UniProtKB/Swiss-Prot annotation:
This is Cellular retinoic acid-binding protein 2. Pfam families: Lipocalin. GO terms for cellular component: cytoplasm; cytosol; endoplasmic reticulum; extracellular exosome; nucleoplasm; nucleus. Transports retinoic acid to the nucleus. Regulates the access of retinoic acid to the nuclear retinoic acid receptors. GO terms for molecular function: cyclin binding; fatty acid binding; retinal binding; retinoic acid binding; retinoid binding; retinol binding. Sumoylated in response to retinoic acid binding, sumoylation is critical for dissociation from ER and subsequent nuclear translocation. A motif (Nuclear localization signal) lies at residues 21-31. Belongs to the calycin superfamily. Fatty-acid binding protein (FABP) family. Changing residue 31 to A: Loss of ligand-induced nuclear import. Interacts with RXR and RARA. Interacts with importin alpha.
Length: 138
């Protein structure tokens, strides 16, 4: 079983602003979010299939607790409440499908994958736009 535990720092990010745009975030808030999310602090604690993930930026901190295979509530990247279900796609990759609790919006999901090089790759998807963020352990 892969070990996602640790404190992670971002080394690369692609398409984050484009993702926020497709989610309908206005231009001013996008600029603030992109600046704040340029240096997130990510803490992951893992015990088997149970995860705690805390992501902190200068603008907001999010925390999620989940067990792979069990539905839980969280927020989409733009802050809308949703139900999420995480499954293992492969030995080192988890996939999360999100469903909005109310209202309409783009179909959203995320994945987290550990590479053989020790990088953590987070992808966030809204409809056809994919944002990729790459982290290394601190």
């Amino acid at each position: 079983m892969p070990n996602f535990s640790g404190n992670w720092k971002i080394i690369r990010s692609e398409n984050f602003e484009e993702l926020l745009k497709v989610l309908g975030v206005n231009v001013m808030l996008r600029k603030i979010a992109v600046a704040a999310a340029s240096k997130p602090a990510v803490e992951i604690k893992q015990e088997g299939d149970t995860f705690y993930i805390k992501t902190s930026t200068t603008v907001r901190t999010t925390e999620i607790n989940f067990k792979v295979g069990e539905e839980f509530e969280e927020q989409t990247v733009d802050g809308r409440p949703c139900k999420s279900l995480v499954k293992w796609e492969s030995e080192n990759k988890m996939v999360c499908e999100q469903k909005l609790l109310k209202g309409e919006g783009p179909k959203t999901s995320w994945t987290r994958e550990l590479t053989n090089d020790g990088e953590l790759i987070l992808t966030m998807t809204a409809d056809d736009v994919v944002c990729t963020r790459v982290y290394v352990r601190e």
